[in-house]
Amino acid sequence: MKYKSIMLLGTASSVGKSTVAAAFCRYFKKKGYRVAPYKALNISLNSFVTKDGDEIGRAQVVQAEACEIDPKEYMNPILMKPSAGFKTQVIVRGKVHCTMDAYKYKELNKYLKEKAKEAYDDISNDYDLIVLEGSGSCAEINLRETDIANMHTAKMADADVILVSDINRGGVFASIVGTIMLLTEEERKRVKGVIINKFRGKREFFEPAMRQIEEIIKIPVLGVMPYFDLDIEEEDSASIKLRKGNGKGIDIAIVRLPHMSNFTDFNSLGRIKDVCIRYAENPKDLENANMIIIPGSKNTIDDLIYLKESGFKEALINESSKGKLIFGICGGYQILGEKIIDSLGVEGDIREEEGLGLLNIVTSFNKEKTTKQVVAFDLEGNEVSGYEIHNGESVPTAKENIWIKEQNGNVLGMKNKEQNVFGTYIHGIFDEGDFGEKLINKLKKELNIEESNDVNYKDYKMSQYDKLCELLEENIDMAYVENLIRY
């Protein structure tokens, strides 16, 4: 049986649309619907590679997990990845389409709308109910002509809209009323309800204000989602939740690169008992860490130069000489090497840059982008898995320091001779299997901290989605929402 799509739009960026959409996905899945997520256009450096080798935004991966289905490219047909110099890499249906100047977006608009519609038709054929998510604010009147992800999608899908607003940042009533007022009459007719998100306090004291806002906008407030402390992946790095330390346990410092991408690579480490993860904003932040991670980067050479100019290079080399564990992922792996060569100008005008010299690899960028899921093995025969997203190839200059290889011999990771510096192209390496837990337990053993045996990360995430669904059912009128999806 087919149902009408339902769309979640926001009064602003970071109001919680992605998380509420994940909650809707989990709710409908548990109710027995064949449900899937869809976001026409996503702007994010935080991406994932599907089983088919297609690249999409992580937000739709989270929502697909909540639906207990495999992520596919048609769930996020357009992904834009900002890079240096006001350039944007445009990924269409999982593959790189072009890299363009940001101001030339309008020239691609018609083509992107066609691709978004094509993907929506495909996903609608495969599933009975689609939970749609918008992007940023749905009332940016200067962007109405080129809109793809918001009311354009609602109209394309003939979907009713639920408006999400964030009370935690203040001004929630003005943002709701202002958003409704800036919509056209046709657009306002689509808005069938409002969800107020991230509420702190007792709801009974808030009820009179909810009734007042309903009188003003003539649209029902479906409920108030409380501010909660669940571990649901966030879409952008500005809102990532890092666990602060208390001076005990394992302290992991993430070097905060200016063009950091795929920050979710280390989320799973933060759930392990007696582990704190934090950003290192300056070189001194590395001194007390037990482990240092250099994450992925959308502009590896620029970030490498930043490490040199900010004093991080000297600090990292110094910490390495003390035997401290240093781990590089993708761009971080390339940075740890001897040299990066960009003869084709893939990232910019700099053709060659000396690396930190902590790993024996030389990286050469090329135009072709590698996107695939991988299963590989370390030196001890332990299976490691995840996905690759990168330009270029890293060639070992000391084969005795190879650490991770695929069965076909392709090298995906290196270590140093002292075995305290490691690097790999594999995103999500800490998420799958027990690799991350083994690594942390090794550190705990060295520091005489009790080892842990934590729950499987996939099971842990499912438990978080279930708790999110419970919050939705307790606080939002989902019977009303279910009536909206019936023809």
Curated annotation (Swiss-Prot):
Transmembrane stretches, start-end: none
Active site: 330 (nucleophile), 427
Annotated Pfam families: CbiA, GATase_3
Function: Catalyzes amidations at positions B, D, E, and G on adenosylcobyrinic A,C-diamide. NH(2) groups are provided by glutamine, and one molecule of ATP is hydrogenolyzed for each amidation.
Upper classification of the organism: Bacteria, Bacillati, Bacillota, Clostridia, Eubacteriales
Record HAMAP family: CobQ
Organism name: Clostridium perfringens (strain SM101 / Type A)
Name listed for the protein in its UniProt record: Cobyric acid synthase
Entry-linked NCBIfam families: cobQ (TIGR00313), PRK00784.1 (NF001989)
GO biological processes: cobalamin biosynthetic process
Domain of life where this protein originates: Bacteria
Pathway: Cofactor biosynthesis; adenosylcobalamin biosynthesis
GO molecular function, one term: catalytic activity
Disulfide bonds: none
Gene3D superfamilies per UniProt: 3.40.50.880, P-loop containing nucleotide triphosphate hydrolases
The keyword Hydrolase is assigned to this record: no
Keyword annotations from UniProtKB, A to Z: Cobalamin biosynthesis, Glutamine amidotransferase
Record's keyword annotation contains Transcription: no
Gene that specifies this protein: cobQ
GATase cobBQ-type domain mapped to chain residues: 249-435
Family of this protein: Belongs to the CobB/CobQ family. CobQ subfamily.
